[in-house]
Structure formats: C-alpha cells, structure tokens
C-alpha cells in the first residue's frame, strides 16, 4: 500500500491500482507527503476492527487492498475510518467515531456519491453537514452465501431472443460501455481495460452492434465481485437484465468468485430474488443530489 497525508488524514491505497482511485487523490498527489512504509499490521488490525460485522464487499475491497481507499484519522491508533471506492460514481462507508473531516473528504471526492453511516451518530453528522445536498433512502443487502440454481439460470440465458447476442466484455465493448452514461458504471471503476481484465468480469447484450444491457463488476475483492446491472431505457422490461445477470453469476461460480448483490431499490431486490438471492437486511444511505 501507498500512504499519503492530507488535512490530518491518513490515506491508504493499492499501489498497483492507484489510477482507479478517487479523483481528489489523483489531482492533489503533489500536495501529499509520500511515505513508503507499509501500514503496520497492528494499525491494520485496528482498522479492520472498526468495520467488524459490516458485510459489504466494497468495504472488503478497500480493506484487502484490491480497489478503493481506506482513510483514517490517525496512523497509529485510528478511531475513525472511511472506506471509499469509485471513480465516476462512488460509495463511502463511515465507521468508528464520527469525524467531520472524513465526511467532507468524501463529499469533495466525487459528485455522484452514496454515503453509508455505521450508526445514528454518523447519520446525524452527515445530515447536519450536507443538509439539502443529500437524499436519504433505503438500500437492501442480500445474504453472501446464496446457493444458486444453475439449471434455472441456464434456462434464463436460453430465453435470449434471436435478434440479441450476449458477449463477455472485451476491449472494444469496454470502450463502448464508457461512451453512454447509462452503461458507464458497468466498467467505470477500472481505469483502463487491462485493469478490468485483471480484476473485473462482465457481459453485455448487443442488438444491431449496440450495447442494450449488461451485468458486470461494479467492484472487485479477493474472493468475488459486486454486481452492477444496467439496461438501456428503450430495452427495459424484456428480461435482458435477468439474462445478463444469469450468465455473469454462472461464470463467477465457474471461477470460484462470489457474485455479491446489494440492491439500490426494491425493483433491484426483486430481480436479485428472482435470480436466487435472499434478502438480508435494510440499511440507511445518503445520496448526493446533483
């Protein structure tokens, strides 16, 4: 990991994949004090303890150094921590003792941001600082031990109409995903195709040489991915998302990866349940209103 200091915060991130990190860390690099030491094992244990029991793969991505950053208030004895991941759109998870500096850092890092507080104290601080800038809403977590019905998923894939084709995301399709706003998040958290190929995984459905739907990795962690699914508005309600997700899930299982699903809406939760996922719990989140 590389270590930088900014505004009395300590920022840790993966050296190899630093280019995919949050914008403020790229643009302000020259202002940081570079420190070549590796995060002390004792410090990392304390950071892990701040997030104990929080079964969110984006947090796992940051903690295991695959993607994203861990930002803490103190290098030797952290009391507050932020796990943040994303480029065009980002998630920020706040743990430990509420710290306004961590909230302002996250808000300034990305305009398309979802913030998740660990407790009421964090939530109150977010609401007080952000005011009308944020929208409070409910997200839906699923269990992380789903036993999928593979034959049923295969049947979903076989329902693909003949005028559509499903492809794994290659370099050309990666670039195509970035050209449209609705499909950007399918690959947008990987700074280039080589990073996506190494860490990510995804499928798109094509009609007349244009991408119309897809299911891919929003993020990656050591043992799996967090699923992102998107469909062009003109092609919704045709079962294309179900088909793309079914193919992605099967491929993940073939590669011993867990395809995690965290639902933004009840509609997303219903799709997840259709694919075999089981609801775990609701949780509070805040979205920056652009």
Task: Tell where the protein language model's regions lie, with residue ranges.
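Conserved acetyl-CoA-binding loop-helix of GNAT-fold acetyltransferases
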Residues: 100-103, 237-250, 270, 274
């Amino acid at each position: 990991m590389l270590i930088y200091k900014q505004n009395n915060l300590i920022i840790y991130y993966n050296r190899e994949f630093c280019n995919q990190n949050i914008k403020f860390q790229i643009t302000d690099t020259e202002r940081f004090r570079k420190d070549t030491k590796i995060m002390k094992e004792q410090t990392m244990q304390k950071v892990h303890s701040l997030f104990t029991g929080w079964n969110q793969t984006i947090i796992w991505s940051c903690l295991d150094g695959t993607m994203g950053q861990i930002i803490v208030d103190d290098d030797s004895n952290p009391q507050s921590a932020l796990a943040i991941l994303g480029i065009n759109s980002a998630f920020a998870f706040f743990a430990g003792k509420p710290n306004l500096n961590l909230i302002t850092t996250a808000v300034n890092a990305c305009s398309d941001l979802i913030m998740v507080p660990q407790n009421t104290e964090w939530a109150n601080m977010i609401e007080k600082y952000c005011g009308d800038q944020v929208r409070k809403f409910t997200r839906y977590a699923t269990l992380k031990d789903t036993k999928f019905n593979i034959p049923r998923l295969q049947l979903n894939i076989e329902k693909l109409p003949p005028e559509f084709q499903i492809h794994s995301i290659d370099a050309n399709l990666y670039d195509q995903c970035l050209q449209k706003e609705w499909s950007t998040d399918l690959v947008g958290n990987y700074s280039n195709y080589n990073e996506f190929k190494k860490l990510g995984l995804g499928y798109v459905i094509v009609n007349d040489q244009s991408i119309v739907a897809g299911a891919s990795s929003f993020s990656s962690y050591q043992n799996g991915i967090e699923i992102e699914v998107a469909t062009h508005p003109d092609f919704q309600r045709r079962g294309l998302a179900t088909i793309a997700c079914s193919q992605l899930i099967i491929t993940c299982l073939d590669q011993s990866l867990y395809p995690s699903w965290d639902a933004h809406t009840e509609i997303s939760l219903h799709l997840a349940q259709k694919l075999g996922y089981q609801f775990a719990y609701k949780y509070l989140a805040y979205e920056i209103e652009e």
